[in-house]
Each structure stands twice: as C-alpha cells, then as structure tokens.
Design a protein with these regions (language model features):
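Beta-propeller fold detector
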Residues: 59-62, 78-81, 120-127, 175-179, ...
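Conserved beta-strand positions in repeat-built beta-propeller and related beta-rich domains
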Residues: 100-106, 139-141, 155-161, 195-204, ...
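Beta-rich, blade/repeat-based domains predominating
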Residues: 83-96, 128-151, 180-192, 198, ...
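Blade-level signature of beta-propeller repeat domains, shared across WD40, Kelch, NHL, RCC1
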Residues: 395-434
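Short loop/turn segments that connect beta-strands within beta-propeller blades
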Residues: 113-117, 167-172, 213-218, 271-275, ...
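A short helix->beta-strand "capping" segment at the edge of beta-propeller domains
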Residues: 62-86
Length: 539
C-alpha cells in the first residue's frame, strides 16, 4: 500500500464530463433500485440480458451522471467539471490554493489547483467498486469526510469499507487503516492531532491515536461506548450515527445518534479528559434526524436536521433548544409548484472564519450561511439541476437538484462543495456583496387566534429586484401550517442605497400551542436571499 499511486495531471480545459447523484445517507442503493424499477422498460426475448444491462446503464447515467455536461454559474457560484467521467465526488477539503476531494466511483483522491486551474488525481490503492459496471448496485463506495491534519502534510479521508486512509503530499504514498467503526463517516482531530470518528452503522464513538496507528492494521484505534438506554426497544439495525464535532477549547466531543423511522434522536457530550459521557440530550420527536454538527464561538452546538427544513441550536449552559428554518423549498426544484411535503433537508454544518455557520440544503439546492449573532440567513442558489431527483412534470424545462453533498470553508469564507449528481465541484464566493439586508424586530408576542403586524425593512446596497419571503418553525417543511402571513407587497424593487418598509401581518391559528416559535422574514431573487429570524411568543 505504500507504493506511489498513479497520478494524472489534467488541464481544466481538456476535461470530459458525465454527471451523477444521491438521495440519503444510508439507503442510496435501495433508492436507486426503486427508481429504476419504476422506469426501466420491460424487455423479453433474445438478448434480454444485454438489453436489460443497456437499459439499466442508460437509466443510471440519466440519474447519476446528469445531463448538464458543462459547468454552470451564477453571481455567486461557479462550477468546475471534474477530469474523469462519473467520478461521484462527496468528501472535500481546502488546503490553501488546493481543493481535495474523493471520487467515490473511480476510487481517486483528487486535488484542484485553484490558481492554475489544473487537476491532479491519485488512484487509491484499494477501491473495490472501481471495476464494477454501472449496472451493479451500488457501484460506488462512499467517502463522506476529507480532512487535512494540523501539519498540512497529510490528507485523511473515510472509506465506507471500514477504512480510513492517509495520503502524504510529499511522498504521494497512501496508508490504509482498518478501523472498528462500521461504515466510517465523520471524523475530526483533537488539539493533539488525534482522531475521533463515527460510523453510520455503529452506535459508538471511536478514537485513533495517530502516534500508534500502523499501515494496514487496526493498531492504535479504540471504541468508546455510548449509553444507549434512550434507544431501548429499538432494533440496533435502526440506530445510526449522525454527526460529530470536536470542541478543542473545552476538550469535548459531541456526537449524535438517531433512529429515523422511530423519530428518535440524541446528542452526546463526551469529556476527553475524564473519558466519560457527561451529557445526553433527548431531542424532540420533530428533530429526529440530527446529522451535521458544529460549534459556534460560545460553545453552543448547532445541528442540521436531515429529515425536515430545520436547523437548531443547543445551548449547553441553559439546556435548551432554539429552532430555525430555511426558506421554503423553491418551486424551481419541482418545475413550477412546491408540493406540501417538500423539505430542504439541511445536511452538514461548518463554521467560517468570521463565526458564521454554513450548511448545505440537500434537497433545497442551496447553500446557507447563518450569522448566529444577527440571526440572519443568506441562501445561495446552486445553478445546476438534475431532473432525475425531483418529481418533475414532463413539460418542465427547469427542475431538479444538484445533490450538493459535502463542503468545506476556507478562512476567507470561500466555500467549495461537491455535486454528486453533476460530476462537479463548485466555489461559492462569499466575498461578493449580497444586494440587500433586512431589519426586523427581534421578537413579537400575541395570543392564539390574534394577529400582529411586523415591520420588515429591506435595505439595498446595490440594485435589487425580487420577492418577499417568509418561513417558520410551525411545520417541519418551514410552512406556517394553519397560521397565516401576508406581506403588504409581495414584490420589491430597490435602487442602490435605498430602503423600503413592508408590513407582514401574521395571524396565529386558534389551536396553536403556547410557546416560542421562529419566523424567518426577508427577500430574495433567483441567485440569493436574505432573511432575519423573529421570535414569536404565543401567549
């Protein structure tokens, strides 16, 4: 395994492209089989096997290789097509001017030089699905996380085949470590450069002592059991690991477990110094898919719920949860009209250099940036759409999602993400100014069945024309449920330097439970939106 891998250098201008996709964190193959079985033609007679294979490969290419072979772009996002066909990139990391990613089909560790516009790709020594035909299900091997260690010398990445890999940039050698986690997914380094990681099909936390690990062995790895009393009565096959984040300042590791079908999720706080789980947080049933996890500058835990349109903050000092939501899923995803059961599915969260929290909206086809101080959400539209991953009407010319699967943020708040459906990586340039900001009151209070007027001031830093937007934590899909909200004006056009106050009248439904909710109010256009959170106290 220590032999130097095959290396390829490819100019950006000479790429061939075919494109690809995904739907969830575990049952990808099952989804593909189900979708294919609904759409594959019935074939019988001589040559049936060959024709079936051809039909299945064609369907696979339509769903997992996409149809948009050229990179797309908008004001903020610019895509880059990968050099090989059907690479299926997922995990990604940024190292200065280099962007690293893993091809889950081809078994390649790739790097893109953002200054030169060139690729290097290194063949991972062992990747069983590399040689499988597209007609095999699955014909890929997931690599969810790519990390660069503190020295900047090594690239680490997970491999669903119970493996973690390390690539040395200087020697161009790979080391392979067999780990006790089943289907390793997320990993992070502690302040000493050691590894903590989880496996999708494991219900434990795992530790890797980097000074003791040995190539080709499981030496130096240990399992840290998590108390599972909260999942009593649930089959272990249904309990999976969600997310992980290491708190280097406080020497803690936060982990989430979930049983999605049972709408059950928990957060665990593990103290590195005492080697004990010191806190277990039972999540409400409407937050049963805690996946992405990150810490803000104050030690609060932020979690993306990959079963709804919700992301939330857990405050350890107050032991409470505050919910926020994305915008409602765009009708562009569905060819003109958003169905009532459409969710944006926030997936992973990472913190930018300025403390802002980034997350990818898996089925919302957006990248979100949330300011935890201002409680302001900016969402950036991803310009590619694969119609095979939405219920698109035949007449729709624009429909689908790009399946943005993982992302990384550099210190300057530039973000790179992978598009598993499109065989592309993409850069989001957050240094470009968003054309508007929104000012709202911090909170309002009203009784059930009553109405209140909320003043929303839209301030333009450049010319802007768009639509007013509202969403709320009343429903899992960010809709208002039986409550209602009406803007005094649905459209807004502003010249640079101007502002406009628009009224939003919110009426709480008669049977709404007392408590605190959040409404997100703002405006957006085809490329970007800006929304502010308003606390709504139902008394």
């Amino acid at each position: 395994l220590s032999d130097s891998p095959r290396k390829k250098t490819t100019p950006q201008s000479s790429k061939k492209i075919i494109t690809y996709a995904i739907i969830g964190i575990v049952a990808v193959a099952a989804v593909y089989v189900a979708m294919f079985s609904r759409s594959a033609p019935e074939i019988s007679g001589p040559g049936t096997n060959t024709q079936n294979d051809e039909a299945m490969q064609q369907r696979f290419e339509e769903q997992f290789c996409g149809t948009q072979t050229a990179p797309n772009s908008n004001t903020y996002v610019a895509e880059v097509a990968l050099p090989a066909e059907c690479e299926m990139p997922v995990g990604i990391a940024i190292d200065g001017a280099k962007v690293w990613y893993v091809s889950t089909k081809r078994g390649l560790l790739g790097s893109y030089d953002t200054a030169a516009g060139t690729f290097n790709e290194y063949e991972i020594p062992s990747w069983p699905t590399r040689s499988l035909p597209f007609t095999s299900v699955p014909s890929w091997s997931m690599s969810w996380t790519v990390k660069i260690d503190g020295r900047g010398e090594n690239i680490w990445f997970t491999d669903q085949n119970n493996t973690i890999w390390r690539f040395n940039q200087s020697t161009e050698d790979f080391d392979m470590f067999k780990v006790p986690a089943k289907y390793p997914s997320m990993m992070d380094f502690d302040s000493n450069g050691n590894l903590y990681f989880i496996g999708i099909n494991s219900q434990s936390l795992f530790f890797g002592n980097v000074s003791r690990i040995q190539n080709g062995t499981s030496e130096g790895f240990a399992e840290i059991s998590l108390p599972l009393e909260g999942f009593s009565g649930v089959s272990s096959d249904l309990v999976t690991s969600g997310g992980l984040v290491v708190d280097k300042e406080r020497s803690d590791v936060w982990v989430s477990l979930l049983a999605f079908q049972q709408k059950k999720g928990q957060l665990f706080q593990y103290d590195i110094e005492t080697n004990k789980v010191v806190r277990i947080v039972d999540l409400p049933t409407d937050l049963g898919a805690p996946v992405g996890m990150e810490l803000d500058n104050y030690g609060n835990v932020w979690v993306a719920d990959h079963g709804t349109s919700t992301f939330f903050r857990y405050d350890p000092s107050m032991d409470n949860i505050t919910r926020f939501v994305t915008s409602i899923a765009s009708p562009k995803i569905y060819g003109g009209s958003t169905p009532p059961n459409a969710y944006t599915l926030p997936y992973w969260i990472d913190k930018g250099g300025d403390g802002s929290l980034w997350f990818n909206e898996h089925t919302g086809n957006k990248i979100g940036r949330f300011d935890p101080e201002e409680l302001a959400l900016v969402e950036y539209w991803i310009p590619s759409q694969n119609r095979a991953w939405a219920l698109c009407p035949p007449e729709a010319t624009v429909c689908g999602i790009a399946n943005a699967m993982q992302f990384a943020v550099d210190p300057e708040n530039h973000l790179w993400f992978t598009e598993w459906t499109e065989n592309k990586i993409a850069k989001l340039d957050a240094s470009k100014q968003v054309p508007i900001a929104v000012v709202t009151p911090a909170e309002v209070a009203l009784a059930r069945g009553e109405s209140t007027e909320i003043k929303v001031t839209v301030v333009a830093s450049s010319d802007f024309s768009g639509q007013m937007m509202a969403s709320g934590t009343f429903m899992p899909n960010a809709a208002l449920g039986n409550s209602t909200g009406i803007f005094s004006e649905e459209s807004v056009s502003l010249s640079s330097g101007s502002s406009k106050e628009i009224s939003y009248t919110f009426t709480a439904e008669q049977d709404l439970k007392q408590g605190q909710y959040t409404i997100m109010l703002g405006a957006g256009n085809d490329d970007v939106s800006y929304m502010k959170a308003v606390r709504v106290n139902i008394i």
